[in-house]
Amino acid sequence: QLGIKDSVKLDKTYLTLLPQPFSEELVKQYSKIFNGRYFVNENASKDLFINQAKEHKIIHIGTHAESNNLSPELSRLIFAKKVEDKENYDENSLYSYEIYNIDLSSNLAILTACETGKPTYQAGEGMISLAHAFNYAGSESILTSLWEIDEESSAKIVKLFYDNLSKGMPKDEALRQAKLSYIETAEGRTAAPQYWAGLVLIGDTAPIDLKARVAWWWYLAAGIVALILVLLLIGNKKGETN
Protein backbone atom coordinates (compact mmCIF):
# COMPACT_ATOMS: atom_id res chain seq x y z
CA GLN A 1 0.00 0.00 0.00
CA LEU A 2 1.04 3.56 -0.69
CA GLY A 3 -0.31 6.40 1.40
CA ILE A 4 0.01 9.96 0.10
CA LYS A 5 -1.01 13.08 1.97
CA ASP A 6 0.02 16.71 2.20
CA SER A 7 2.52 17.49 4.94
CA VAL A 8 0.38 20.13 6.63
CA LYS A 9 -0.15 18.43 9.99
CA LEU A 10 3.35 16.98 10.18
CA ASP A 11 6.30 19.33 9.75
CA LYS A 12 9.11 16.81 10.07
CA THR A 13 9.94 17.61 6.43
CA TYR A 14 11.53 20.83 7.71
CA LEU A 15 14.41 18.78 9.06
CA THR A 16 15.14 17.31 5.62
CA LEU A 17 15.13 20.57 3.64
CA LEU A 18 18.39 21.14 1.83
CA PRO A 19 20.40 24.38 2.14
CA GLN A 20 20.29 26.75 -0.82
CA PRO A 21 23.85 28.13 -1.15
CA PHE A 22 23.43 29.41 -4.72
CA SER A 23 20.31 31.40 -3.87
CA GLU A 24 22.00 32.79 -0.76
CA GLU A 25 25.03 33.97 -2.71
CA LEU A 26 22.79 35.48 -5.39
CA VAL A 27 20.70 37.52 -2.98
CA LYS A 28 23.77 38.76 -1.09
CA GLN A 29 25.43 39.90 -4.32
CA TYR A 30 22.49 41.71 -5.85
CA SER A 31 21.20 43.30 -2.67
CA LYS A 32 24.50 45.21 -2.62
CA ILE A 33 24.28 46.12 -6.31
CA PHE A 34 20.69 47.37 -5.98
CA ASN A 35 21.20 48.88 -2.51
CA GLY A 36 18.70 46.51 -0.93
CA ARG A 37 18.47 44.43 2.24
CA TYR A 38 18.67 40.68 2.66
CA PHE A 39 17.88 38.20 5.41
CA VAL A 40 19.25 34.66 5.38
CA ASN A 41 19.31 31.54 7.55
CA GLU A 42 17.84 32.09 11.04
CA ASN A 43 17.14 35.76 10.23
CA ALA A 44 14.78 34.82 7.39
CA SER A 45 11.70 34.46 9.58
CA LYS A 46 8.07 34.70 8.58
CA ASP A 47 7.37 37.64 10.92
CA LEU A 48 10.34 39.62 9.63
CA PHE A 49 9.25 39.06 6.03
CA ILE A 50 5.73 40.27 6.70
CA ASN A 51 7.05 43.41 8.43
CA GLN A 52 9.73 44.25 5.86
CA ALA A 53 8.37 43.14 2.48
CA LYS A 54 5.85 45.86 1.64
CA GLU A 55 6.51 48.69 -0.83
CA HIS A 56 9.74 47.52 -2.46
CA LYS A 57 10.56 47.48 -6.15
CA ILE A 58 11.67 43.85 -5.98
CA ILE A 59 10.84 41.13 -3.45
CA HIS A 60 13.05 38.06 -3.85
CA ILE A 61 12.25 34.89 -1.91
CA GLY A 62 14.62 31.95 -2.27
CA THR A 63 13.24 29.21 -0.05
CA HIS A 64 11.37 25.91 -0.09
CA ALA A 65 7.67 25.67 -0.84
CA GLU A 66 4.90 23.08 -0.85
CA SER A 67 1.96 22.98 -3.22
CA ASN A 68 -1.19 21.55 -1.63
CA ASN A 69 -3.36 19.96 -4.32
CA LEU A 70 -6.20 19.14 -1.93
CA SER A 71 -6.51 22.63 -0.43
CA PRO A 72 -4.64 25.23 -2.52
CA GLU A 73 -5.13 27.89 0.15
CA LEU A 74 -2.81 25.77 2.31
CA SER A 75 0.08 25.86 -0.15
CA ARG A 76 2.96 27.42 1.73
CA LEU A 77 6.36 29.08 1.72
CA ILE A 78 8.69 27.76 4.41
CA PHE A 79 10.74 30.29 6.39
CA ALA A 80 13.29 29.82 9.18
CA LYS A 81 12.03 28.35 12.43
CA LYS A 82 12.25 30.12 15.76
CA VAL A 83 14.41 27.93 17.97
CA GLU A 84 12.71 29.16 21.14
CA ASP A 85 9.20 28.32 19.86
CA LYS A 86 8.86 24.59 20.63
CA GLU A 87 5.06 24.47 20.79
CA ASN A 88 3.98 26.13 17.54
CA TYR A 89 5.42 23.82 14.88
CA ASP A 90 3.79 25.84 12.10
CA GLU A 91 4.99 29.36 12.91
CA ASN A 92 7.47 29.36 10.02
CA SER A 93 4.90 28.58 7.29
CA LEU A 94 3.38 31.38 5.23
CA TYR A 95 0.21 30.03 3.63
CA SER A 96 -1.56 31.25 0.52
CA TYR A 97 -4.61 32.37 2.49
CA GLU A 98 -2.34 34.58 4.64
CA ILE A 99 -0.60 36.15 1.65
CA TYR A 100 -3.94 37.45 0.32
CA ASN A 101 -4.20 39.67 3.42
CA ILE A 102 -0.64 41.09 3.35
CA ASP A 103 0.53 44.26 1.59
CA LEU A 104 3.18 43.04 -0.88
CA SER A 105 3.18 46.04 -3.21
CA SER A 106 6.12 45.71 -5.60
CA ASN A 107 7.09 45.94 -9.26
CA LEU A 108 8.34 42.36 -9.19
CA ALA A 109 8.24 39.37 -6.85
CA ILE A 110 10.76 36.60 -7.51
CA LEU A 111 9.74 33.26 -6.03
CA THR A 112 12.60 30.83 -6.60
CA ALA A 113 10.97 27.98 -4.71
CA CYS A 114 9.51 24.68 -5.87
CA GLU A 115 6.04 24.79 -7.45
CA THR A 116 5.18 28.38 -6.44
CA GLY A 117 3.39 28.84 -9.76
CA LYS A 118 1.76 25.39 -9.93
CA PRO A 119 -1.99 26.14 -10.03
CA THR A 120 -4.94 24.24 -8.62
CA TYR A 121 -8.50 24.88 -9.77
CA GLN A 122 -10.96 26.08 -7.15
CA ALA A 123 -14.61 26.68 -8.04
CA GLY A 124 -15.45 30.38 -8.14
CA GLU A 125 -11.78 31.42 -8.00
CA GLY A 126 -10.18 29.82 -11.05
CA MET A 127 -6.55 28.71 -10.84
CA ILE A 128 -5.04 29.29 -7.38
CA SER A 129 -1.31 29.31 -6.59
CA LEU A 130 1.23 31.12 -4.41
CA ALA A 131 2.01 33.35 -7.40
CA HIS A 132 -1.69 34.23 -7.71
CA ALA A 133 -1.69 35.18 -4.03
CA PHE A 134 1.31 37.49 -4.49
CA ASN A 135 -0.37 39.16 -7.45
CA TYR A 136 -3.53 39.74 -5.41
CA ALA A 137 -1.41 41.15 -2.55
CA GLY A 138 0.03 43.88 -4.79
CA SER A 139 2.96 42.43 -6.76
CA GLU A 140 2.60 43.71 -10.32
CA SER A 141 4.56 40.82 -11.81
CA ILE A 142 5.91 37.52 -10.51
CA LEU A 143 8.83 35.39 -11.62
CA THR A 144 7.80 31.95 -10.47
CA SER A 145 8.32 28.22 -11.00
CA LEU A 146 5.97 25.65 -12.50
CA TRP A 147 7.69 22.59 -11.05
CA GLU A 148 10.51 21.53 -8.75
CA ILE A 149 13.42 23.53 -10.13
CA ASP A 150 17.14 22.94 -9.79
CA GLU A 151 18.57 25.51 -7.38
CA GLU A 152 21.90 26.05 -9.15
CA SER A 153 20.47 26.46 -12.65
CA SER A 154 17.66 28.74 -11.46
CA ALA A 155 20.18 30.93 -9.60
CA LYS A 156 22.22 31.29 -12.81
CA ILE A 157 19.13 32.26 -14.79
CA VAL A 158 17.93 34.77 -12.19
CA LYS A 159 21.42 36.32 -12.09
CA LEU A 160 21.30 36.84 -15.87
CA PHE A 161 17.72 38.10 -15.50
CA TYR A 162 18.84 40.73 -12.98
CA ASP A 163 21.67 41.81 -15.29
CA ASN A 164 19.21 42.25 -18.16
CA LEU A 165 16.78 44.21 -15.98
CA SER A 166 19.59 46.58 -15.01
CA LYS A 167 20.10 47.25 -18.74
CA GLY A 168 16.52 48.48 -18.99
CA MET A 169 15.01 45.43 -20.72
CA PRO A 170 11.32 44.63 -20.31
CA LYS A 171 10.88 41.83 -17.81
CA ASP A 172 9.69 39.22 -20.33
CA GLU A 173 12.58 39.93 -22.70
CA ALA A 174 15.03 39.97 -19.79
CA LEU A 175 13.90 36.45 -18.85
CA ARG A 176 13.98 35.20 -22.45
CA GLN A 177 17.51 36.48 -22.98
CA ALA A 178 18.58 35.04 -19.61
CA LYS A 179 17.36 31.58 -20.62
CA LEU A 180 19.07 31.79 -24.01
CA SER A 181 22.35 32.81 -22.36
CA TYR A 182 22.01 29.94 -19.88
CA ILE A 183 21.37 27.39 -22.65
CA GLU A 184 24.45 28.56 -24.56
CA THR A 185 26.75 27.69 -21.65
CA ALA A 186 24.87 24.73 -20.11
CA GLU A 187 26.54 21.34 -20.40
CA GLY A 188 25.14 17.82 -20.43
CA ARG A 189 21.78 17.23 -18.84
CA THR A 190 21.62 20.77 -17.41
CA ALA A 191 20.73 21.99 -20.91
CA ALA A 192 17.45 20.05 -20.78
CA PRO A 193 14.21 22.10 -20.45
CA GLN A 194 13.69 20.65 -16.98
CA TYR A 195 16.51 22.90 -15.75
CA TRP A 196 15.44 26.20 -17.33
CA ALA A 197 11.88 26.13 -18.69
CA GLY A 198 10.18 26.03 -15.28
CA LEU A 199 10.78 29.71 -14.55
CA VAL A 200 7.99 31.87 -16.02
CA LEU A 201 6.88 35.48 -15.74
CA ILE A 202 3.32 36.42 -14.80
CA GLY A 203 1.80 39.90 -14.95
CA ASP A 204 3.22 43.27 -16.02
CA THR A 205 6.24 43.09 -18.34
CA ALA A 206 7.35 46.74 -18.24
CA PRO A 207 11.01 47.54 -17.39
CA ILE A 208 11.98 48.45 -13.83
CA ASP A 209 14.00 51.57 -13.04
CA LEU A 210 16.67 50.11 -10.77
CA LYS A 211 18.77 53.27 -10.54
CA ALA A 212 18.78 54.87 -7.10
CA ARG A 213 16.82 58.11 -7.17
CA VAL A 214 18.19 61.11 -5.35
CA ALA A 215 15.59 63.07 -3.40
CA TRP A 216 14.85 66.63 -4.56
CA TRP A 217 16.05 68.10 -1.27
CA TRP A 218 19.56 66.75 -1.94
CA TYR A 219 19.69 68.87 -5.09
CA LEU A 220 18.35 71.84 -3.12
CA ALA A 221 20.97 71.35 -0.39
CA ALA A 222 23.74 71.06 -2.98
CA GLY A 223 22.51 74.26 -4.64
CA ILE A 224 22.49 76.13 -1.33
CA VAL A 225 26.02 74.93 -0.52
CA ALA A 226 27.22 76.01 -3.98
CA LEU A 227 25.55 79.42 -3.53
CA ILE A 228 27.21 79.87 -0.13
CA LEU A 229 30.60 78.99 -1.61
CA VAL A 230 30.10 81.51 -4.42
CA LEU A 231 29.11 84.24 -1.94
CA LEU A 232 32.13 83.45 0.22
CA LEU A 233 34.44 83.63 -2.78
CA ILE A 234 32.94 86.96 -3.84
CA GLY A 235 33.32 88.25 -0.29
CA ASN A 236 36.98 87.15 -0.19
CA LYS A 237 37.72 88.84 -3.50
CA LYS A 238 36.13 92.09 -2.31
CA GLY A 239 38.20 91.91 0.88
CA GLU A 240 41.39 91.41 -1.13
CA THR A 241 40.50 94.37 -3.38
CA ASN A 242 39.92 96.67 -0.42
Which role does the model predict for each range below?
Residues 1-242:
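Catalytic cores of enzymes
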